[in-house]
């Protein structure tokens, strides 16, 4: 669950720090209130395309950072596979974009490539907007949800280890 979103130097946003309460969150507002800008920053954080044109002040980089409450999620395997420090309660994801468009991504302060970032964050956030396709229709997401609800993280980690051993044999 997204518990905090920090945005700095993105489009019209100089700095914004939002704390979310537990439960369902809806972002609403009048036309021009900035909903799409916040959604754009969140999309960037989740592995979306970095665009140097979104840099508000070219002397500073864009920083979008989110804190997630991951208690109860089956994510330990991702952290282990990517050699990232694991905290079963909380995870911090950060994306930075320079004025030249160069982008860096981090999970718990460990650098990750954008592909791994996308894979990881699809397990944390599902954005639904008008006319959008739902991630719920993808088999991988359905399996991840079932495994998470069944608390299969240890079984999945053991399977992954056995599979890697078989591939390396």
Where are these regions (language model features)?
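Gly/Lys-enriched N-terminal cap/neck module of very large, oligomeric protein machines
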Residues: 4-166
């Amino acid at each position: 669950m997204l518990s905090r979103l920090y945005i700095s130097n993105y489009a019209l946003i100089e700095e914004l720090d939002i704390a979310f309460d537990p439960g369902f969150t809806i972002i609403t507002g009048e036309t021009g209130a900035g909903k799409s800008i916040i959604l754009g920053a969140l999309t960037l954080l989740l592995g979306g395309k970095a665009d140097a044109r979104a840099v508000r002040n070219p002397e500073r980089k864009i920083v979008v950072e989110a804190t997630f409450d991951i208690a109860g999620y089956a994510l330990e395997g991702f952290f282990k596979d990517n050699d990232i420090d694991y905290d079963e309660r909380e995870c911090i994801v950060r994306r930075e974009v320079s004025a030249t468009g160069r982008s860096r991504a981090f999970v718990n302060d460990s650098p990750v490539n954008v592909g791994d970032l996308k894979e990881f964050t699809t397990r944390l956030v599902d954005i639904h907007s008008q006319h959008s396709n739902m991630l719920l229709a993808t088999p991988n997401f359905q399996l991840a949800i079932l495994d998470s609800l069944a608390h299969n993280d240890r079984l999945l980690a053991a399977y992954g280890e056995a599979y890697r051993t078989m591939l390396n044999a």
